[in-house]
Structures are given as structure tokens and as C-alpha cells.
Design a protein with these regions (language model features):
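Mid-to-C-terminal "cap/lid" subdomains and adjacent gly/pro-rich loops that border
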Residues: 2-129, 141, 158, 162, ...
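FAD-binding beta-loop-beta segment adjacent to the flavin cofactor pocket
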Residues: 126-138, 234-253
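Short, small-residue-rich loop/turn micro-motifs
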Residues: 141-143, 257-258
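Glycine- and Gly-Pro-enriched alpha-helical subdomains that act as flexible
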Residues: 147-148
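Conserved, non-catalytic sequence blocks in retroelement Pol enzymes and Pol-derived host proteins
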Residues: 155-163, 265-270
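Short FAD-binding loop at a beta-strand-to-alpha-helix junction that anchors the flavin cofactor
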Residues: 248-264
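A conserved FAD-binding loop/helix module that cradles the flavin
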Residues: 262-281
Length: 294
């Protein structure tokens, strides 16, 4: 919205013949998304359908979460199977020029080809906390109804890739532990097969390298998807001041996830809602006085 309104990097605005209201090179920059990678775990028997309820916070800089019981019918697999169900949400995993309608249709086709048995168990995922890799948002045209181009540059920073590798290795240790013996059989050989299986089962837009799971780094790159915690682009001190007022203009604030340098660990919607309420009350009290009670 700022870019379309003429607030942003001058060169980017002038390229689309947008009148420059304020030249700020930081608008749309410094964006990030917490990359997520998951390993699908086949169960020996039926499992209870369960969304993520517990988060394991490790010293490795990754969060470990789990979900189970998705895909109780063929239709549910093709149309909805948990965190990997949104076609558009995965477009950020490929370069902007490759984000075509044909790519989306190919993605949908791959979803339909996934075996029903793949979703009789569940999955364990790891996501990177506070990613170092940064991206940006840029306009494709001046039509407000069209999506902009967003690139997060997953794993561009080597520290993020190292953390993903450590997280996947930790999950592999978990599924080979005594605790999984009654529900899933995941010895070393089986775990390698599950990793290969997970490469195909993770339905993103990234070209796959199956049978290459000895390279955990490649597994991370092949199976990365969004967990919808993207943030940044209007950072405090660069685009807005500590009261979230846009620097260089009057009577304009931003209160959303674009302010975050780091996204809260789980469900950032709650934090955004809290910020909205806080700023709403602050504005009312600034106008009407501290005695305002809401």
C-alpha cells in the first residue's frame, strides 16, 4: 500500500511511473519468513486427528511441532491436508518469473497424485526461529488488485541452512527412539526411505531431488514451505517511528506484521491483534484524554 501510494524507493516507484511522495529505500525491504520443513511419519494403525498443540523449543534455533490424522479420505487429501494445503502460499518458494498459472496447476496435480496412505499417520516439522535470510516485496504493476512480487530467499544465509539440517537430524533421532516403536517403525533404513518419501510428499513448487536424502542440506531446500509467519518490510526505525508513525509524512501509522524484525514463535495473529487494540486505545486517549475507559 505504501509503494502504491508513492512511499518507497524512488527508483522502484519511478520505474512504474508512480509519483514519489517520499523516497525511503527501506520500504518493502528486510522481509523474512520462517522456513518450515516436515517429515511424514507413517503410522502402524489409525491415529487421532490432531492439530499442533505443543511446541518443542530447542537450543538449536529451531522449533519442533507435530500434527496427525490428516487425510481420512481421498478427497480430503486432494483438497485439504493441513499446513501444506494452500497453493498460493507456496509461490514464494520459487523465483518470481516462475510463478505462473501453469505452475499452480502443476502443484495441484502433484497433490492429487500423493498416495492416500501418506496421510494416515502425521508429520513432524521443524521451523527456523528468527531467520537470518532476508527478502523483499516489489510491485509488478500499479493495479492494487494484483499481487506484488515477494521473495524471502529461504536458506540464503548459511546459518539458516545449518539450523534446518540440525532440526531434521533431531527429528530423525526422535522417530528412531523408543517412544515411536509402538506407533511407527523408523529404523535407520526406514528413516532414509521416509525422507525420500517426504521429498515427494511435500507439495511445494521447488524442483525435487529424490533419492538424495544423504544430503540433508538438499532435503531442506527441496521441502521448504511457508508456515505463514512472514514479517518485515516496514521496520521500526527505518519506515516507522516507535509509535508506528510513518517517518517523513503526517497522520499515517502502520500496525501489522510488517513491523516485526522477528515473528513471535507461534500464532503471530494474537500479537498483531494486541498491537491493534493497544494503538487504538492510545490514539483515543491522545485525542480524548487519559480518562477514557474502554
Amino acid at each position: 500500500m505504501l509503494l502504491l501510494s508513492g512511499i518507497g524507493p524512488r527508483a522502484d516507484l519511478e520505474k512504474l511511473n508512480i509519483s514519489v511522495v517520499l523516497d525511503n529505500k527501506f520500504v518493502g525491504k528486510g522481509m523474512a519468513d520462517n522456513p518450515m520443513n516436515s517429515i511424514f511419519i507413517p503410522a502402524k494403525g489409525p491415529v487421532v486427528q490432531s492439530l499442533i498443540q505443543t511446541v518443542g523449543i530447542t537450543e538449536l534455533g529451531v522449533y519442533i511441532e507435530a500434527s496427525s490424522g490428516f487425510g481420512q479420505s481421498n478427497d480430503s487429501i486432494q483438497c485439504h491436508h493441513g499446513l501444506v494445503s494452500a497453493e498460493i502460499g507456496q509461490l514464494s518458494t520459487i523465483p518470481p518469473k516462475e510463478r505462473t498459472p501453469e505452475a499452480i496447476q502443476a502443484y495441484i496435480g502433484r497433490k492429487k497424485d500423493i498416495p492416500h496412505e501418506a496421510f494416515k499417520g502425521g508429520f513432524i516439522l521443524e521451523k527456523i526461529a528468527d531467520p537470518f535470510s532476508k527478502g523483499q516485496i516489489s510491485l509488478i504493476n500499479t493495479n492494487a488488485d494484483d499481487n506484488p512480487s515477494i521473495t524471502f530467499n529461504y536458506f540464503k544465509h548459511p546459518h539458516d541452512l545449518r539450523r534446518c539440517v540440525n532440526g531434521i537430524r533431531l527429528i530423525a533421532e526422535l522417530v528412531q527412539s523408543e517412544h515411536f516403536k509402538n506407533s511407527a517403525q523408523c529404523d535407520q533404513l526406514t528413516t532414509e526411505r521416509i525422507l525420500n518419501w517426504s521429498v515427494s510428499a511435500n507439495v511445494n513448487f521447488v524442483p525435487k531431488h529424490t533419492n538424495d536424502t544423504k544430503s540433508v542440506e538438499q532435503f531442506c531446500k527441496d521441502t521448504v514451505i511457508t508456515i505463514w509467519h512472514y514479517h518485515g518490510g516496514c521496520l521500526v526505525g527505518r519506515v516507522v517511528d516507535p509509535d508506528y508513525k510513518v517517518l517523513g509524512v503526517q497522520k499515517l501509522r502502520i500496525v501489522d506484521g510488517s513491523l516485526f524484525r522477528d515473528s513471535p514463535g507461534t500464532n503471530p495473529q494474537a500479537t498483531v491483534l494486541m498491537m491493534g487494540r493497544y494503538m487504538g486505545l492510545k490514539i483515543l486517549r491522545d485525542r480524548l484524554g487519559e480518562a477514557v475507559v474502554i
